[in-house]
Amino acid sequence: MSITDILSAEDIAAALQECQDPDTFEPQKFFQTSGLSKMSASQVKDIFRFIDNDQSGYLDGDELKYFLQKFQSDARELTESETKSLMDAADNDGDGKIGADEFQEMVHS
């Protein structure tokens, strides 16, 4: 499976363009521009599984750092502050990782 099986390459490119400079990544804006926020819960969880490198069922800080690169391989890494903000936005139970349900809730919030 490729991420472009779910999201259009054009929408992904537009979303990445909006946050190409360090410290400009805004999760909700990215989810809207990429089309992710319009996807069903099932489709969002498919994207989650694609981002979950080690297939642990959770996204940790290292996986979040490379979040944008899962959408396009030559995208930049998230900065430390962007990674922390993304974690804080989704980690509802405070366990230091993001589960599939937490990710889906963040995308659709």
Swiss-Prot record:
UniProt keyword Calcium present: yes
Cellular component terms per the entry's GO annotation: cuticular plate; cytoplasm; extracellular space; protein-containing complex; stereocilium; supramolecular fiber; vesicle
Tissues in which the UniProt entry reports expression: Found in tumor tissues and not detected in normal tissues.
KW Cell membrane (keyword) present: no
Amino acids binding Ca(2+) 2: D91, D93, D95, K97, E102
Origin superkingdom: Eukaryota
UniProt binding sites for Ca(2+) 1: D52, D54, S56, Y58, E63
Protein's name according to its UniProt entry: Oncomodulin
Endpoints of the signal sequence: none
Gene giving rise to this polypeptide: Ocm
UniProt keyword annotations, A-Z: Acetylation, Calcium, Metal-binding, Repeat
Domain EF-hand: 39-74, 78-109
Modified residue annotations for N-acetylserine: S2
Function in brief: Has some calmodulin-like activity with respect to enzyme activation and growth regulation. Binds two calcium ions.
Homology family: Belongs to the parvalbumin family.
Organism (species): Rattus norvegicus (Rat)
Family matches, as CDD domains: EFh_parvalbumin_beta
GO MF, any single term: identical protein binding
Any one Gene Ontology BP term: cochlea development
SUPFAM superfamilies according to UniProt: EF-hand
Taxon lineage: Eukaryota, Metazoa, Chordata, Craniata, Vertebrata
